Amino acid sequence: MELRIYDKSGNLRAEVCPDDNSTQQKAVMGDNALSVSFTTWEAIPFDIGDYVDYEGERYTLLTVPCPNQASTLEYEYAPRFQGIESELSKALCFLLTDGDMDSDFSLTDGPAAHLRLIVDNINRVKGTTDWRIGSVIAADYKVVTYDGIDCLTALNRIAETFETEWWIVGTTLY
């Protein structure tokens, strides 16, 4: 299998062949990462924001990997590309109304409205309108307090409040 790595502008940075030590870790309401091990003949100038698209999801470098120079001609890499979940832990959750951005608020509504809040924040952070809500449980209105928390914490708080789970497939939040 060949894996294409792009810079944050979408330009091809490298094409690599991951070895058998490469893994994907993905859990409902948990970690989502792609650890890729490979050897190249040239050093690769990785940068934060480089990404790979794998099985319909985008995985992004949040730290720059350091190569191990195995010989004068070989470089061994083991970068860890993170799913959107890790990016959400770095993004403050805002109530986005009338151009205002409030990070300390409470919302009384059903699960769909709370998920809409998260999707709006993901689209804000990613600079897109690609993210959407998938199927949502039916439930009565409940109060969720967003007291200066990040989007990942907010998602977990919503799930706890409505006694359910969340997960992401592609650019859809369920």
Regions found by a protein language model. Name each.
Residues 1-47, 79-88, 94-107:
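Juxtamembrane "anchor/assembly" segments of surface/extracellular structural proteins
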Residues 1-9, 39-67, 97-124, 156:
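Short, acidic/charged, Gly/Pro-enriched secondary-structure junctions
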Residues 14, 21-27, 51-52, 69-70, ...:
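Short, exposed beta-strand/loop patches in secreted or surface proteins that constitute
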Residues 15-21, 60-65, 138-143:
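A broad structural signal for short, well-ordered beta-strand segments within beta-sheet-rich domains
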Residues 28-30, 71-73, 149:
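Solvent-exposed loop and beta-edge segments used for protein-protein assembly and interaction
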Residues 52-82, 167-169:
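Short beta-strand and beta-hairpin "edge-sheet" elements
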Residues 76, 82-174:
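Charged- and aromatic-enriched interaction segments used to assemble
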